[in-house]
Amino acid sequence: MKLILTAAVENLGVAGDIVEVKNGYGRNLLLPRGLAIVATPGAEKQIEGIKRAQEAREIRDLDHAREVKVALEALEGVTIAVRTSESGKLFGSVKTDDIVDAVKAAGGPNLDKRAIVLPKNLVKTTGKYQVEAKLTDGIVSRVKFEVVAA
């Protein structure tokens, strides 16, 4: 089944890509969730126009992403206050929403929570941590924060 992606799909492509997938994957996952549309000649022409406009937008986005990267790496004093046990273990864990809110509260730029990449071993104790923020393709910034007991 030939589809045009309307959003980025992991291990498949980004918005605007024309992909060939198995019928069941397309009908049962991609189409119902709005991640793709059926590739027709008219839709392919429309996507070409959208891609040209998107390329012009990406140039502006790269400049903005570089500015955000500089702002994030210069940011100091990002703290997240959470409830902990006496031994310093968190009740739960720090999530991407918490990091985005803490960066915003510290005077940093607005981030999309999907841009934050948490480590496999989640943040479950107090201390200093560092995570990556994927701003665009090829531009990754490090966000440093400290988890403290509330």
Swiss-Prot record:
A Pfam family reported for this protein in Swiss-Prot or TrEMBL: Ribosomal_L9_N
InterPro entries the record matches: Ribosomal_bL9 (IPR000244), Ribosomal_bL9/RNase_H1_N (IPR009027), Ribosomal_bL9_bac/chp (IPR020594), Ribosomal_bL9_C (IPR020069), Ribosomal_bL9_C_sf (IPR036791), Ribosomal_bL9_N (IPR020070), Ribosomal_bL9_N_sf (IPR036935)
Source taxon at top rank: Bacteria
Keywords: Ribonucleoprotein, Ribosomal protein, RNA-binding, rRNA-binding
GO biological process: translation
Keyword Ribonucleoprotein attached: yes
Function: Binds to the 23S rRNA.
Protein family: Belongs to the bacterial ribosomal protein bL9 family.
HAMAP family xref list: Ribosomal_bL9
Protein name, per record: Large ribosomal subunit protein bL9
